[in-house]
């Protein structure tokens, strides 16, 4: 009798829960051995990885995948190199598990503090990019978590080949294969099952398009670490160094159009707009960026009229909305109303203005005189990241190793009894 998708996912979940107890108590040295051995296995399996990826690319072309999707799907030699380097970098990171802080004596004589521990089992749902399999597996492993990885059906052969390398690495370190499990079925019902197993899965991390993340957020029966959009702003204030502001705004938009930290709306103070916008617009046009602007912007430069929808849109493309604002108050109001609480920046040399912006903009990252594209775990010194969270509970901003752990209280006594002196 063929195993149903629900039975299959339940089997994975049960195995992951058992494996989480093993990896949760594994030493840092053992976890690092698994990471280094996986890196070596990837290096030895380059031909197998390339062959599996060629199957996915051929199927993708036959199924009419867009060129951008095919590009993300490709496992080039450079990307294989990147996966190997990434594993070694995670191995070199400090292990957060077991760290104890804030120990203090209470009047009763007991000591109270906090210990950092793994979350348990992390389910990760992602699309297209097979290198995410390694990113996610390495972070979960190092942070002492078991993980169930459900990649996109378009990358199934690549993910299976990568999973074989991970299994070799785990075996060499004496860890069970169920520490990292890749979902083998392409049936979409697997996603529904994975997000509905609170008895086996402690948290879900969706990485992909807005539709996927909305579905997971709506239907999940376990906590979700996620962000929906990256509608990021740069506000150029009246107190900005304009040449510096132009460089920051240009980098924020053009570093990479498709990342969630790319600037989508440029806010410019009305007092400097006439001096700033013409040359700024010329730089964007030379780069091929389509500009859309409010009425006041259009009085200064020739741009497409911006609609209400533009302020709500994450373009992930060479398109930029521009709005002239009356000052700091309107800039903050615009960001908090239209933004996605991801990453927003101010360019200003006025310290009290900067402090207000940092305090009042309700985003997971706030930049001062720096572009929003710095919103990245590596740039923040976290090493790799599992994703970026715009929620306020548990992790917020780029989620690295520490974000895949939590704290529990530890209480140490010497026979003290409550209510007795």
Swiss-Prot record:
Keywords per UniProt: Amino-acid biosynthesis, Cytoplasm, NADP, Oxidoreductase, Proline biosynthesis
Family, as annotated: Belongs to the gamma-glutamyl phosphate reductase family.
Q: Where are the transmembrane segments?
A: none
Q: What is its EC number?
A: 1.2.1.41
The pathway noted for it is:
Amino-acid biosynthesis; L-proline biosynthesis; L-glutamate 5-semialdehyde from L-glutamate: step 2/2
Asked whether the UniProt record includes Transferase among its keywords, one would answer: no
Named from the GO MF annotations, one term is: NADP binding
What organism does the UniProt record list as the source? Answer: Pseudomonas syringae pv. syringae (strain B728a)
Provide the organism lineage as a comma list.
Answer: Bacteria, Pseudomonadati, Pseudomonadota, Gammaproteobacteria, Pseudomonadales
NCBIfam families hit by this protein: PRK00197.1, proA
Q: Set out the biological process GO terms recorded for this chain's protein.
A: L-proline biosynthetic process
Main location per the UniProt record: cytoplasm
Q: Which GO terms describe its cellular component?
A: cytoplasm
Q: What is this protein called?
A: Gamma-glutamyl phosphate reductase
